[in-house]
Amino acid sequence: MLRRYVTALVGRPKTVIAVVMAITLTLGFFITRLRLMLDIDSQIPPGHPLVIVGQRVEKLFGGKYITVVGFYPASGTVYTPQILAKVKRVTEALAALPGIKEGSVLSLMSPRVKDVHSSEEALEITPLAGKVPETDAEMAAFRERVKANAFLTSLMVSDDGRATSILADFDDFEKAGGAKNLYGRIENIVAPERENGLEILPAGAVTILYWLLVYTRRVAALFVLALAMIGYLHYRAFRTLQGMIVPLVTAIMGVIWALGLMGLIGAPMDPWNIMTPILLLAIGAGHSVQILKRFYEEYARVKEARPDLTSVEHNRHAVIEATVKVGLVMLAAGTIASLSFGSLAAFGLPSIKNFGLCTAFGILAALTVEMTFIPAIRVLMSPPSPRQTEREKREEYFDPILEKLASIVRNGRERPIFWVFVCLIVVALVGVRRLDTNNSLGAQFFEANVPVHGFRMADSRLAGTRVIQVLIEGNAPDTIKNPDVLRRIDELGTFIAKQPLPIGKVVSIVDLLKQMSRVMDNGGPGTLPDSVQGVAQYLLLYSMGGDEKDLNRLVDHDFQNAVITVYLKTDDFLAMKALTVAASQEAERLFAGLPVTARVGGGVTNAIALNETMVRGKTINLIQISILVVVITSLLLRSLAGGLLVLLPLATSALVNLGLMGWAGIPLSMGTAAISAMAVGIGADYAVYFIFRVREEFQRCGDLRLATATALTTSGKAIAYVASAVAGGYLCLTFSGFKVHVLLGVLVALTMVTSSAATVAFLPSVILRVTPRFLKRQ
């Protein structure tokens, strides 16, 4: 059936090329619809309890796009007229930005930050700073007011006065400019205020999203670099321009098909699936190399067997034979690769799901192009000249290694190789036990990256920028005014503050009530009212002097819901998880029997939810991939043993890579989660091609050792070049500067080394030990 298809195809090559080009141009048009989108929600697992709580908190109190602008003088304190004037100007400019959440801009110079104090007549609530203090006396009085209102001001100024910050939140991120423009607008505001001896650094979600956008855009240039790298390696493989250009053209067509479909269906590009073009380029070019390598073999064989035919007829027969013999294997390998990437949907994360599904379609698209365009274009091209065929056979740097392996196989000395790989697997298993998950800031950026500096400064000199929140939900309006509920909120806040973690500040509505009590009692201990009426009276007093909107970040309008916000000075995953667990357990104990529900979530707990989802998704993904490989190859080879043999080098490669990550301390994160699927999706080609070639040669010569040695010097050579091309292409990502891309580039390159080595070294040693019967079947 396949032979009839290929024969018909090469009979109408121009028609086939025209159809393929028409589809390519049509889908290429839709690439213009592609949009680069950076959405925080696409990186967190929907439906996870911690995420649900976080989304509820964001809806009630905001905080999703909170930004901290820190002022860090190199010497002295921030209590100078010059620095405070800068803080005031930046505060006013941020408050005027479109999309800013009303009343969310807080600083020492913000009218929203109040001074709660008493006078001879009554409790008074006035802005902390009506104007910038200019004289020494004014500055001293201002510092006293800041100290007296530390329940709030400690969020915005360090105890030693060496740093201060402005907090801002946005309720309409797109109106504010989105990731592309908002950071630039903030920079335009703070840049004129910078001077020698004063650092002004933005930090927060806006900063992270902007730099993700910067690093993501660099991938376009890296794609061109990867294209050049893969082209060079293909030229080394064939020593002809045809051998270099044809695989690249077909691979680029596959990329166009995949990106065009993404544009057609409206799938966004993000920092994770932006790497899809490089991946498809590598896989598509790899398949093409397998066909073309086999074409040169078949051309030499047909030319020797049928000297009576013309060179054009030799070319046509070679195209048919190469496509028929490689086609079925390519379809199997491509199907495995496509399903392997499609299985990434098991992670339940929108970004990884999009990456997997888009790559799966791209592989099928590349497969379609390779099974149509390559035979059609190859049959129209001039037959290889004697010089071209001779250059294609020229020894390259992989040949001595493969010849050595073939010699070891022929002489029956492969046992040490078998035991070396067994030992490597054992070491890898130990490393896997050390593997951890981490989706913190440090897992995505290098310490030297620009956005990290702002976070680290805020951590070391201020209250921090990362938060964990406890949502207190009442059964009815005014529930939060219940004195018992307020006491439990206070107790929970005290419990959290005492945890052995770098906690910068714990903020809740009780801080304001205790400060008012402290002022009214002339410096008393600050106690909470013991009745609903007492609480209501405090709040009435505040509304008379202040503004009820000042409370919007602490309680909702009906006093039915409140939030405790914990500011952290670390992004250590284990510390955050320990705090989340402890706070959840204590909240459950404290609020038992009260008409409220207390749940922990929001902020950095999204990273905890992401880690838990990834561990579960990774396990499911590995099981799915293993089953897919065994089922498909077992059906194709009509042997369960054959399916297990194909799985062996893939499992070895995935295991070694995960083990290395464990030993090297590289965590499982958003950037490295897809490594196993990529190891199988790309590496499946190697094992399938090799086993089919061993079977073909075994049926021809009847000697398993000779057949395996021949497969090593033929398919093994193609495998080596494909692996080197994929590795070279992905190593280009190391120039990105983005830790996720750098790690992925290195790990994929390592995957290519381990999967190809396991195929040409470990797999032959296993085949020769078990002598599977399916190799003898036609």
Language model regions located:
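Signature of alpha-helical transmembrane segments and their immediate interfacial
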Residues: 1-38, 326, 376, 390-440
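Helix-loop junctions and hydrophobic alpha-helical segments within the transmembrane domains
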Residues: 298-335, 698-724
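Hydrophobic, glycine/alanine-rich multi-pass transmembrane helices and their short helix-loop junctions
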Residues: 331-373, 630-634, 656-667, 695-696, ...
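Membrane-proximal extracytoplasmic
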Residues: 1-231
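Extracytoplasmic
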Residues: 85, 131-241, 252, 487-490, ...
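Hydrophobic transmembrane alpha-helices and their membrane-interface caps
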Residues: 243-292, 642-692, 731, 758-762, ...
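Solvent-exposed, non-transmembrane loop/terminal regulatory segments of multi-pass membrane proteins
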Residues: 16, 31-78, 84, 132-157, ...
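Interfacial segments of transmembrane alpha-helices in multi-pass membrane proteins
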Residues: 11, 213-269, 346-350, 620-665, ...
